[in-house]
UniProtKB/Swiss-Prot annotation:
The active site is at residues 20, 38. Pfam families: Acylphosphatase (PF00708). Keywords: Hydrolase. InterPro entries: Acylphosphatase, Acylphosphatase-like_dom, Acylphosphatase-like_dom_sf, Acylphosphatase_CS. Residues 5-94 form the Acylphosphatase-like domain. The gene is acyP. One of its GO terms (molecular function) is acylphosphatase activity. PANTHER family: ACYLPHOSPHATASE. Gene3D superfamilies: 3.30.70.100. This is Acylphosphatase. Belongs to the acylphosphatase family. It comes from Corynebacterium glutamicum (strain R). Coiled coil: none annotated. It catalyses: an acyl phosphate + H2O = a carboxylate + phosphate + H(+). Its EC number is 3.6.1.7.
């Protein structure tokens, strides 16, 4: 199965509401590696590496409105970028 790297910039009310914690739990459930980080402009940057189907599922969960996964906050837009994996391990909040 091909591994990929997803970088998703999540816009909306996503800081100070448990969004990074929720993203980490979803990524760990999907067995993805990477991170979820607050950006100074109010966005959250999610980097995930793993099988393409699993990364696509995380992206679907990030974008879904309303969320059937009890996602905290409110997502307005998700900008995605795809690339080659860098072989990171584990998934962390930053």
């Amino acid at each position: 199965m091909e591994k990929v790297r997803l970088t998703a910039f999540v816009h909306g009310h996503v800081q100070g509401v448990g969004f990074r914690w929720w993203t980490t739990s979803q990524a760990q459930e999907l067995k993805l590696a990477g991170s979820a980080s607050n950006l100074s402009d109010g966005r959250v940057c999610v980097v995930a590496e793993g099988p393409q189907t699993q990364c696509e599922e995380l992206l679907r969960r990030l974008k879904e409105n309303p969320s059937s996964y009890r996602r905290p906050g409110h997502v307005d837009t998700v900008i995605e970028q795809w690339g080659e994996p860098r072989d990171v391990e584990g998934f962390v909040e930053r």
